[in-house]
Amino acid sequence: MNISGELRGVSIGGGSTIQDAVIIQNMGESGITTLKIGSNCKIGRRTILSSEGDACVNIYDNVSIHNNCVVIGSVEIKPFSILSANIFISSGNHYYRHVPHRLIMRQDKEVAELHLSSGVRSTVIDEDVWIGWGAVILNNAHIGRGAVVGAQSVVTRDVDPYAVVAGVPARRVGDRLKFLPRPEISSHNLEDWPYFYEGFLHLDPESEIILRGFRFRDFVSVILSQRLEYHFEFSCSTLLKAVDNIKSIKINGKDCSFAESKDISDVVSVCVPLQFLVIDRNGSNNAFMLSVIFHSSFDSGMYLKSVKGVGVVA
């Protein structure tokens, strides 16, 4: 292993294995940790991990990176993700079209510095992602939880959770899981866990994504608290306005009964034609069970967001 730059700016967790000829370059400011490797990670032979300036390479716990990979710039790789061999991941891109008559080397450097000064986001690989042999991830792409990237693909845009993408440029060719709305979901059922993951989105073709939200025929937000029950039919505008007053909620409106909550800890957004919903949290061990009972047919899908744990309220 070859560690280049300020050693004190590199953090390696316990139980991690760094194999032969790995190069770790921390080119950030002296004394600032900009390259982090979590616990129980595996870094394969001849892999290069490089951070520079304010950019941080952050590899979370239980990540496996195979031989001959390059990870450079501002990159996050979250737990239990697998990178096959010969993968290139960067938060940047190259620029050659802004001033075509200038040398590519010069305009690329100038435009890249301009993008960095404006705060370019990181490239993010979420939990449980599998990236195939020889893939390239560029342009601050965000690979959603559970996604699969095919061998030798070039990813330049975000990938949805549990999607399977392949090609140059990478396009969606399938889904790892088929998220069909269920009449009931429970955190105690392993097959239902993906429905609780932040970022999961199930849309039917008629649903429309709009600025700062989603437009569904039915839309309601559910609050996780110590103990909470809902029993209502829909009033979209009333419910959305009520969620803004987050300290203590009492929902009343057209076709609605009421719902009260105190000490709100989290919000789950549900977009689905449902009629009855119960949340019951056991305060003694912080465990909770979420049951969603649908009274009508499924034609608008479901969207769950911002649950901080599966079966546990953080």
Residues covered by each model-derived region:
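Flexible, glycine/small-residue-enriched loop-and-beta-strand segment within the central core
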Residues: 2-137, 168, 176-177
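Short strand-turn-strand beta-turns centered on an Asx-Gly dipeptide
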Residues: 79, 248-256
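Extracellular carbohydrate recognition and processing domains
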Residues: 256-284
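Short loop/turn segments at connectors of secondary-structure elements within structured domains
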Residues: 6, 31, 71, 83, ...
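Glycan-recognition and processing domains
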Residues: 179-231, 237-246, 259, 267, ...
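Short, solvent-exposed loop/turn motifs
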Residues: 169-172, 255-257
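C-terminal/domain-terminus segments
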Residues: 133-166, 170
